[in-house]
Amino acid sequence: MRTVLTAAATAALIAAMASPAVANSKDEAGTPSSNAAGAATSALKVNERNGSFDLQSHRGGRGEWTEESLAAFENSLALGVTTLELDTHLTEDGKVIVWHDDTIQAAKCADTAPATAGDPEFPYVGDRVAELSLAQIKTLNCGFVQLPGYPEQDVIEGNRIAELKDVYQLVRDTKAAKVRFNVETKVESSQIGGAGMDSLTRAVVAEIQASGMAERTTLQSFDWSSLNLTKEIAPELPLVALSSGDAWMGVGQPGASRNLGGIDIDDYDGSLPKAAAAQGYDVVSPTFRSVTPAMIAEAHELGLPVIPWTVNTIADMERLMDLGVDGIITDYPTRLRTLMAERGLKLPKAYEVKG
């Protein structure tokens, strides 16, 4: 079992995760404030105690560019974000791709041609990712239409679904030495705690370790059994406990929860921070609507940063920052970066990307 972090250690972890850029443009981004450890208490907001704040670009900034596209991640690097947040699935032939949905949806992707002549599985739209090979998935045009509900989204024409290793290579090519990765194992609901979870988790961990950037990567999941397996096979990786709220965790419901790796949340007073700390996780990432001052105070007391998802309006960003969250996952990284600048927070380094 991991040792629970002290408040000082929490501040250091948050500063390392946020990797803020210093005001002097000649300096490299990411030097934590020297007063972080000495000033850290659960009563202090992270943006007051060390100036760091984790700006996470959700799916590469879904509100601004075609989600999970390499172009979106590249644009996020050019903008200047702390963390690239992304989802992973496993193809039929064992390749880790960066995509959110279990099935290929017509609202996002269109068939172009079969991967091989006469492929009996063609067309592929509507099929499960787990039942398609990488070659089949690569034929899909997943950049042809603006996603409904995101009127500011720029369509990345002809986008092809990327592999996880491609995102790491992009960051390597860009020499984005301070940007971090928050990688989600997107376990299908039917596979929670099962064989599908196991194979996906092992494949994702292997890709992270092969990237040479494991020290800049956190692994997150709504299937806490995936976190537990990661803790066993890669104890060096920080783990992020995702939560969709009390009902999802099973608060007040009898018995153990499949979502939570077989624990009963009521054994931890219905508390996300208490449950996550007891399991040895490093960060809590609740839905933003469930965040309360009490949750933040409890999490910080237990040594856990709080990074809610998915926060898209300025009003919600301001409210959560005032409460003292340690970062925000957003579809609109430009909005959050602008707000951080207005508040005098140190901004993540913006990188020059190849045109």
Language model region names:
Residues 2-9, 15-355:
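Phosphate-group recognition and catalysis centered on beta-loop-alpha active-site segments
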